Amino acid sequence: WVEGDWDGLHYRLELVLADQATAWFWHVELFNASLHHERVDLLLLQDLALAPWGAVRLNEAYVSHYIDHHPLAHPAHGTLIASRQNQPVDGRAPWLLSGCLGFGVGWATDARQLWPAHAAGTAEASALGADLPSARWQHEHSLVALQGERFVLASGARTQRGFFGWLQADHPAASGPDDLSVVDQVMALPEARWTPPPSVADDGGEAGNLFASAPRFAAREARADAHELHAWYPGPWRH
């Protein structure tokens, strides 16, 4: 996980891998440390290949062009994007479902929708200051982009949001409404629930260890005399 501060907001981002499925979760915690309310939305951007490493390195544009992106509308989680590699991989069609843990309201499927040709090579996507276009492009810059529902975070308030990904090695049929049932499997995973981070000492000291957390030995002020020392260490003395 990583954490930091930006414009009065403290954020903590954690990537959690599911133990019982090929799935992952981006958990985001936000705290408004400013003195005024903030309007916030979260974006997920993921460059996709859904192909073997060798094929991707040989021709990224060719592999990207064969990914079919299909937006799906879920009653509780808004817009999802199902991405299927239509160029067979060892006779299989790898498939990824991406969605919001909250409610998705915007989406895009190609990097050119966020980085137009005239902005190629720039660090920041020119479209990040506006809503995602919610239109399907299937060119040679395959990208999943999801925008969560905008909300107001009051001063001193804290919230948790996030996104999920579910990967299948083979999805023989084209993406469609029947795939919405996968969301129930995703949300049933224990990793879908945000868990508080481990506590850290307020003084910024080192993480807890045996010497810092074990009960202290009882001590006394007076020095032990020879009789007590022989009682504690009855064997032969070397010094």
Task: Label each region the model flagged.
Residues 9-12, 87-92, 153-155:
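Short, surface-exposed beta-strand/loop "edge" segments at domain boundaries and coil↔beta transitions
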Residues 38, 151-169:
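Short Pro-Gly-centered flexible turn/kink motifs
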Residues 7-9, 36, 157:
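Short acidic/polar mixed-charge low-complexity motifs
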Residues 1-23, 121-147:
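Extended, loop-rich substrate-binding clefts of extracytoplasmic carbohydrate-active enzymes
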Residues 2, 16-126, 173, 177-238:
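Polysaccharide-binding surfaces and accessory modules of carbohydrate-active proteins
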Residues 10, 23-25, 158-162:
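Intrinsic-disorder/low-complexity, polar/charged segments enriched in Ser/Thr/Lys/Arg/Asp/Glu/Gln
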